[in-house]
Amino acid sequence: MMSKLGVLLTICLLLFPLTAVPLDGDQPADRPAERMQDDISSENHPMFDAIRGCCMPLSCMLLCEPCCG
């Protein structure tokens, strides 16, 4: 009985391998560079001043880059 089950499992894996399953292209794991860029962007920091193009002087201590001093 176990050998028949093993043969059936082997045939199923040969006919439909697990790598043939299509992956969702919208997964963030598929694009790690974009995900990292979005996470560390200083423009998205709440202390970033878009008009001046830099962070407020006190936010340098809060790891907001670039600082204008």
UniProtKB/Swiss-Prot annotation:
Q: Say if the entry is tagged with keyword Secreted.
A: yes
Propeptide stretch(es), residue numbers: 21-52
Q: Where in the cell is it found?
A: Secreted
Q: Under what name is this protein listed?
A: Mu-conotoxin-like Am3.3
Regarding how it is modified after translation, the entry says: Is not hydroxylated. Contains 3 disulfide bonds.
Q: Which organism is it from?
A: Conus amadis
Q: In which tissues is it expressed?
A: Expressed by the venom duct.
Give the family, as the similarity comment puts it.
Belongs to the conotoxin M family.
Q: Which domain of life is it from?
A: Eukaryota
